[in-house]
A protein has these predicted regions:
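Short beta-strand-centered segment that lines the nucleotide-binding/catalytic pocket of NTP-utilizing
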Residues: 94-103
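Conserved nucleotide-sensing/catalytic segment adjacent to the nucleotide-binding pocket
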Residues: 100, 107-151
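Conserved catalytic network of the ASCE P-loop NTPase/AAA+ motor domain
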Residues: 61-62, 90-92, 118-122
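Charged, amphipathic alpha-helical linker segments immediately N-terminal to NTP-binding catalytic cores
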Residues: 4-46
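Glycine-rich phosphate-binding P-loop
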Residues: 71-86
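Conserved small/polar residues in nucleotide/adenosyl-binding loops
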Residues: 157-163
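Pre-Walker A (Motif I) flank of P-loop NTPase domains
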Residues: 64-68
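Pre-Walker A adenine-sensing motif
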Residues: 54-60
Length: 163
């Protein structure tokens, strides 16, 4: 925690301000100092977890909206670890986790968004999506697997589908 307390890590540069237009190219992808993950976890997690618990209580009490948190990253980037270390501290009755891997036979028998819609959280609850419907577009476009995917025809030959 010493590095964090001395200000050797500037977490503000990783934050998105409310109503600010986001340009992901401007965000750094590497940390600027060598800091132990445990130090960061011990320094920030207790406060963040308490804030998340409070937000979850408010979301549940208002029962107006459901919240989706999408974790989109490459394999082994820490999506499962994030679910286990961050969201495991919330009330499990109000949190669901859906992992979107290759579509199952049942999912292929339905329209493109069926499996996503099926996983949406009810009002007052939080749904954590391990990957998203973008995965089907991103992976097939990047790895040239369109012929094996179940993409809508409007995306198959569109040059700006990933934009």
């Amino acid at each position: 925690m010493e590095n964090i307390k001395k200000g050797k890590i500037d977490i503000d540069r990783y934050r998105v301000k409310e109503n600010e237009k986001v340009n992901l190219k401007k965000f750094p992808t590497k940390r600027d100092v060598d800091i132990d993950k445990g130090e960061v976890k011990n320094a920030f997690f207790p406060e963040v977890i308490e804030q998340l618990k409070l937000y979850q209580e408010k979301l549940y009490a208002q029962n107006t909206y459901g919240l989706i948190i999408v974790l989109q990253a490459m394999d082994a980037a820490g999506k499962d670890g994030t679910v286990n270390h961050v969201f495991a501290n919330l009330d499990p009755g109000g949190v669901s986790v859906a992992s979107f891997k290759q579509p199952t036979t049942e999912e292929k028998d339905h329209d493109y968004m069926w499996r996503i819609n099926k996983a949406l959280p009810p009002r007052g609850n939080i749904g954590i999506f391990n990957r998203s419907h973008y995965e089907d577009v991103i992976v097939t476009r990047v790895h040239n697997l369109i012929s094996t995917g179940q993409l809508p025809s409007c995306l198959l030959y569109t040059s700006d589908a990933a934009d």
